[in-house]
Amino acid sequence: MSPWFDYPRYQWQQRHAVVIGAGIAGCQISWHLAQQGWTVSLIERETDIARQASGNLAGVISPKMTAKPSTGEQFYHQAFDYSTQQLADLLAAGADIDWHPCGMLQLNHNEREQQRWEALRDRNLPADFLQCTDSEQTSQLAGIHCDYGATYFPRAGFINPASFCRALIQQPEITLISQVEAMSIAHDDKQWRIHDTDGGVVAQAEVLILASGKDINQFTDSIVFPQLGVLGQSSHAMPTQGSSALKCVIGHEGYLTPAYQSQHVFGATFDREFEVIAVSDTSDQRNWQQLQEYLPEWCAEVAEINSGHAAVRTTTPDRYPYAGAVPDTAFYAEHYAALKHGRTAETYPQASYQPGLFVLGGFGSRGLTTSGLCAKLLSDCINNQIADKDQALLNTLHPARFLIRQLRRGKLPAIS
């Protein structure tokens, strides 16, 4: 029992929501709400959707495994299953999505990966989910020479994120408002009003969802969601007859895709310190050098290297996304301050939240895999449909979790 993570039963006057941000997170929650009969106004400051962190030509959808079963592994496994099933359903319904479930090989390129491989091999997991391969089997599956064994995920693959986002929002219930920057939000008379750069109201609704990536803290004066920003750049390589033999995604410290739209996509850099958000030749060289270290024979087949896409991806200190309601910080500070004394949960009141305000973000580089499940859970929360089996995961993703940790340490949050 964790009353600070409990959600109320919502009673909405209208089933209309505003979502800020049309990357994969914003498009996913818009789609999930539309499936529940909501209308959605989706605000995007760029000229088109999926231009920032979701702007790569190709991105990977795959699980993330640990040597021993863990909460993190369970989350990524569940999210992977959800995303691949969602894609199968969308494609069966006629959606135009560039999804290539060609499989992924995570190379045993260092001691840590080798130890993980050995542990996974001993767990005898289902072969349609995971296989442990030696270097010969890896080379056969990849279609190119590999010096390493690998963990093979046959249902993984790569996708064009923009095509995924576009398919999600091609619903009559969703209205895209592009080239409009949401500068501020205000709440009055049970409505959230979103103001643009001129101060005008561009949309309003009882429910507002912040899905604006690195900018979510721009709209939450009373709470700061801890985020770690990382600049990542992907690179492109022109395919040749030799390089086009690659049949599946290769994972090492980065990733490499088979040829797609006359490019191999590989990368990505991981820079915690940066001054500008832009592609650079230096980052291309770093990506290329890393690829040469693990796949030298394949690299010898490639001639021309080009810059791909650079963007800031934000993750959280515990690497789990945020999916849930925005807490009332003053209420938490007043009613949960005694957590530092170790009082039992039964003595605390149910949590209080900012009315109708929700957040979905902090996906890092794995938003294509995890955003669907997180959006589904957030939609369940908004629609009073939380299943008992999902409660523990919702607690893990709760936007107030770092606030609670702060209060347990006896530190009161700054309240504006």
Model-flagged regions — what are they?
Residues 15-42:
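N-terminal Rossmann-like FAD-binding beta1-loop-alpha1 element of flavoenzymes
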Residues 35-55:
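Glycine-rich FAD pyrophosphate-binding loop
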Residues 50, 198-250, 277-284, 297-302, ...:
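Central helical "cap/lid" subdomain
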Residues 59-141:
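Dinucleotide-binding Rossmann-like beta1-alpha1 core, especially the glycine-rich loop
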Residues 65, 242-355:
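Active-site lid/adjacent beta-loop-alpha segment flanking the redox-cofactor pocket in flavoenzymes
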Residues 67-68, 96-106, 132-169, 269-274, ...:
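Helix-loop-beta segment of a Rossmann-like dinucleotide-binding subdomain
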Residues 151-198, 202-207, 211-212, 216:
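Helical element adjacent to the flavin cofactor pocket in flavoenzyme catalytic cores
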Residues 301-416:
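C-terminal catalytic lobe of FAD-dependent flavoproteins
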